[in-house]
């Protein structure tokens, strides 16, 4: 007992705490090894990670205390100011969190509480894309009310993780052209059936084309570029001639940057980009762990959620430039693979971007741009799903009907101009 009485210094107490944490976690890990599967995770809690964090925080607090108490005056003042600022930020976050949670409860209490869809069951990990549709899999897009499905839609993916585009007329004898579609959930067809997507309606309007859907939930220009840089799509497409279409919405700028909101929404699982070479180099959360952690902190902030803020706070000229450069790089990669320049950017109707410079930037880079912003109002009740914020099948149909007309005006893909 005399040993513990003599060793009562701060460092000794820190050592006792660390030893206690290690012994406790070793005991829990030992129990989990015999009663669980031996992976160190018990009831979804990673015991090793918890132990590391406890020790790391304890050491950090002790070091901070010693520096404030015994450090030079300048360092003491800096650290005290920093701690004060952090405490104020934390206090504001807590208070705004209470207000936000209360307002959310009052807003939703009188509305039907729908659950789903469970997007986590729709994708698999990919070393360059971050996430991709599970190959040869049907994802059931389901919304439930009081535990019962109210909307249930099957979304089928093929062996190349492309959403299957069924033929409107399976008896057509010859489809000798391809149409590659890149984009986000608008193109993939969030909340609509396989025969209600953008690629489907294009294929229905153009019987000599076979459409291939390379889009997915939450995709961005980064994903289109990564797919073209790391996959040989000519080996996935049987036709030798055709076109590629990238469907653009203004939110793709968020994803190109990426903004803190988008880092959080996609949990950092999207392609990283070397802007100097325009090469995709892996998955963002693993290449930039510090930026990823910082982005997640902002994303989870109650202040950000309550005031609907993001970081950066608005689109900067360089953000638009980066987005345009990404789409241009995708066009160049497409041209390398398919040996033609039939790459078009379709600008989806979107009332939120009247002053966007994107169309001008794309045209400056020599891209073929089809501006459909005024084709129909979106978002609007007429063209927005009642059970989701995405476009209706009718909106997709109208868009592809207009695209078909524009292609026919110039005699097909070879003569299309921007």
List where the protein language model places each region.
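Internal/C-terminal transmembrane anchor helices
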Residues: 73-99
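Extended hydrophobic/aromatic segments used for targeting, binding, or gating
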Residues: 203-204, 212-217, 222, 351-393
């Amino acid at each position: 007992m005399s040993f513990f009485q003599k060793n009562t210094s701060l460092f000794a107490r820190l050592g006792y705490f660390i030893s206690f944490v290690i012994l406790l976690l070793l005991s829990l890990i030992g129990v989990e090894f015999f009663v669980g599967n031996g992976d160190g995770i018990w009831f979804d809690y990673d015991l090793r990670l918890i132990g590391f964090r406890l020790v790391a925080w304890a050491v950090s607090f002790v070091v901070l205390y010693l520096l404030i108490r015994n450090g030079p005056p300048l360092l003491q003042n800096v650290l005290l100011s920093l701690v004060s600022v952090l405490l104020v930020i934390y206090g504001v976050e807590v208070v705004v969190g209470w207000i936000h949670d209360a307002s959310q409860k009052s807003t939703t209490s009188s509305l039907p509480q729908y659950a789903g869809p469970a997007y986590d069951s729709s994708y698999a990990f990919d070393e360059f894309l971050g996430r991709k549709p599970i190959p040869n899999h049907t994802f059931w897009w389901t919304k439930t009310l009081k535990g019962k499905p109210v909307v249930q839609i099957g979304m089928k993916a093929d062996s190349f993780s492309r959403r299957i585009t069924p033929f409107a007329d399976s008896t057509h004898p010859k489809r000798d052209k391809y149409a590659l579609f890149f984009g986000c959930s608008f193109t993939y067809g969030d909340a609509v059936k396989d025969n209600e997507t953008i690629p489907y309606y294009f294929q229905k309007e153009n019987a000599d084309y076979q459409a291939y859907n390379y889009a997915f939930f939450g995709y961005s220009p980064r994903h289109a570029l990564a797919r073209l840089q790391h996959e040989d799509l000519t080996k996935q497409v049987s036709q030798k001639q055709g076109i590629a279409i990238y469907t653009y919405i203004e939110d793709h700028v968020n994803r190109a940057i990426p903004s803190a909101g988008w880092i959080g929404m996609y949990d950092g699982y999207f392609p990283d980009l070397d802007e100097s070479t325009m090469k995709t180099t892996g998955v963002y959360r693993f290449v930039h762990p510090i930026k990823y952690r910082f982005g997640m902190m902002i994303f989870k902030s109650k202040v950000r959620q309550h005031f609907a803020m993001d970081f950066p706070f608005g689109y900067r000229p360089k953000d638009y430039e980066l987005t345009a450069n990404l789409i241009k790089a995708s066009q160049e990669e497409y041209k390398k693979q398919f040996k033609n320049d039939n790459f078009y950017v379709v600008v989806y109707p979107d009332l939120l971007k009247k002053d966007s410079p994107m169309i001008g930037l794309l045209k400056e880079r020599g891209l073929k741009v089809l501006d459909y912003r005024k084709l129909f109002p979106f978002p609007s009740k007429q063209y927005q799903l009642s059970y989701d914020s995405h476009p209706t099948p009718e909106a997709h149909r109208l868009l592809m009907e207009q695209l078909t007309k524009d292609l026919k005006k110039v005699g097909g893909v070879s003569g299309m101009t921007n």
